[in-house]
Design a protein with these regions (language model features):
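Active-site-proximal helix/loop segments of hydrolytic enzymes
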Residues: 1-123
């Protein structure tokens, strides 16, 4: 299953969470499911949910999320310790399905592409 992460230390938390949730909605609409294993309190994981229905967790101290001044989301597309999922993630069809869903989620939260770069609408 997939996981999405945002940091409460990111100054753009509301936008980060909105985009992460939109990506989660799109991934679920594509037939993919979030994994709950990051919320389990084993092996020091125990991450709190930000949006359980859409697979979004808080990961406050992850450097790439907390130090950016822009909205930030980290996607874990699957769990490779699950051998079946690892094999599926290696297929072009699964990668395309994931990429299309992420693109739809980004579009839903107002990220557009143009001129070779992505930007938030309204910024």
């Amino acid at each position: 299953g997939f996981s999405l992460f945002v940091s409460r230390r990111n100054p753009q938390l509301a936008q980060s969470l909105a985009c992460a949730s939109a990506i989660g909605v799109a991934l679920r609409a594509a037939g993919l499911r979030p994994t709950p294993h990051h919320a389990m309190n084993a092996d020091g994981i125990g991450r709190p949910w930000a949006d359980e229905a859409n697979g979004v967790y808080y990961y406050d101290n992850l450097v790439v999320l907390k130090y950016t001044r822009l909205p930030g989301v980290l996607l874990e597309a699957g769990v490779i310790i699950n051998r079946d999922e690892e094999r599926e993630l290696a297929t072009p069809a699964r990668r395309a399905l994931t990429a299309e869903a992420v693109a739809a989620g980004l579009q839903a939260c107002g990220v557009t592409s143009g001129g070779g770069s992505a930007r938030m609408q309204g910024n």
